[in-house]
Amino acid sequence: MRPLTIIGPTGTGKSDSAIEIADRLSSKIAVEIVNADAYQLYRGMDIGTGKVPLAQRRGIPHHQLDVLDVTETATVAGYQRSAAADIEAIASRGALPLLVGGSMLYVQSLLDDWAFPAKDPAIRARWERRLAQVGPARLHADLVRRDPAAAAVIPLNDARRTVRALEVVEITGRPYAASAPRIGSPRWDSAIIGLDCETKVLDERLAARTKAMFDRGLIEEVISLLPCGLARGVTASRALGYAQVMEALKAGADTQALDRARQQTCLATRRYVRRQRSWFRRDRRVRWLDATVSTAAHRTAIIEAVLGAWRRAS
């Protein structure tokens, strides 16, 4: 069964659309949803990640949700292996795999079947020691000397990617970009649909979404996860909303600190949306649909358009 993929920026209604599509098809074919959001992999991280509550999933099987503890590190390679196995198992059952999410690397690694460069723990440890000694700016300067093209696209403060680039350059003897995958025919010949909407409208949705998360108990959720090791988690601790709330709690959790956390979460989400758009828009395989209007009639029209595109592609 040819998979269907729904991608797009945060706040465009991907998860709700996926459930509606699965529900619409349920009388004809079974549908199983595969998550492609890095932070929805974590158990207990529900409110801040926009995870659809179990009661609202309409009995539709979901995969790649709640598979990691907050202390475990999520990796693109690990996700790729697990999600690919899920998709192939779903298809083997004669069901439709429906991939949904906005984590750019996760989506592309899966659809383009990325081959990841080898790792060398000793080399990585040496660059990590160098990072600890000189800091991210000096380490980035090392990358500028060894691979200017990689340094040009890796932010100065992104120490993890800088370390990885230096590791790959040393292992392969080639520029980091030489190991980067290219966009080709999507794996499993998946149909790819993108949802987006006007920036002004999406910014308003993100503000409302952030407020709703805090109103629903994001602060309490973060507090409940701290004894589980949230602050120690390499990946989980960086999640939007969670990182900001932890900073507010450190600052005393007064009204001013928590208001600042909410504002910073909204601003950080808007910045993330810009990066999502930039990444996804370069993929010419995507058929984009406008999700600006949120009336019931327009949502129905979007579902029909998605299904039509999938049927034509199939």
From Swiss-Prot:
The record marks S103, R124 as: Interaction with substrate tRNA. Keywords: ATP-binding, Magnesium, Nucleotide-binding, Transferase, tRNA processing. GO terms for biological process: tRNA modification. Substrate binds at T10, G11, T12, G13, K14, S15. ATP binds at G8, P9, T10, G11, T12, G13, K14, S15. It comes from the Bacteria. Its EC number is 2.5.1.75. Its cofactor is Mg(2+). It catalyses: adenosine(37) in tRNA + dimethylallyl diphosphate = N(6)-dimethylallyladenosine(37) in tRNA + diphosphate. InterPro entries: Dimethylallyltransferase, IPT, P-loop_NTPase. The keyword Nucleotide-binding applies. Gene3D superfamilies: 1.10.20.140, P-loop containing nucleotide triphosphate hydrolases (3.40.50.300). PANTHER family: TRNA DIMETHYLALLYLTRANSFERASE. Belongs to the IPP transferase family. Monomer. This is tRNA dimethylallyltransferase 2. It comes from Mycobacterium ulcerans (strain Agy99).
